[in-house]
Amino acid sequence: MKNEKIKTNSGITIIEIVIGITLFVIIAGITIVSFNPAGQFARARNSEREMHLTALMIAVKQNIAESISGSFNCVSGPIPVSSAKMASASGSYNIAPCLVPNYISVLPYDPKAAGAHYAGVSDYDTGYFIAQTSSTTSTAITISAPSAELGQIISISR
């Protein structure tokens, strides 16, 4: 008997390549949709806003604690009773000279609010708002982040 060699083709066909690419695209699409990067970034920015508001509140409370009168000591006057933007522009509450550098090194600003920035005590816009409410029994200071994302309301009162 003769040894006959059977010839076999051992290559990858175009159909196998197309199936492999299709599976890769489907899995990648499902992964990207399930992670929702835009939502993850929005949640991260909201967490950053919460940290900013906490830092600002701590600085304000330290100012009050060190004040002889027990109230907020600021060249801009008392904290407004109606919500006011913390910024250096006219019509805003200029809080930076009262906090920087004694109570906080730099003012934090909203990561996505239009125009929010900090270039120094005389040029800033935090994108955050502050108000003080008083009753016969207590005084509360509220700092809020109106540019919060995902429908979340971010504010801190103490």
What are these regions (language model features)?
Residues 42-53:
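Membrane-proximal amphipathic alpha-helices
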